């Protein structure tokens, strides 16, 4: 999947670093928020959070 990095850092939903990605196509699990906490803004199902080692630039 491809997209734009919109967030890098710690989150409230899980320990450790995360990368928030706005996907080019729907297929994500969120809109940039998780459990009511907004990390970045995008359309529903276009947001995804992945571990940094899963990101290719």
Q: Can you name each region flagged by the protein language model?
A:
Residues 1-57:
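Ser/Thr/Pro-rich, acidic low-complexity intrinsically disordered regulatory segments
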């Amino acid at each position: 999947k491809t997209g734009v990095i919109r967030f890098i850092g710690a989150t409230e939903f899980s320990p450790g670093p995360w990368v928030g990605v706005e996907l080019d196509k729907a297929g994500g699990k969120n809109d940039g928020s998780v459990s009511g906490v907004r990390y970045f803004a995008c359309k529903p199902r276009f947001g995804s959070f992945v571990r940094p080692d899963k990101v290719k630039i």
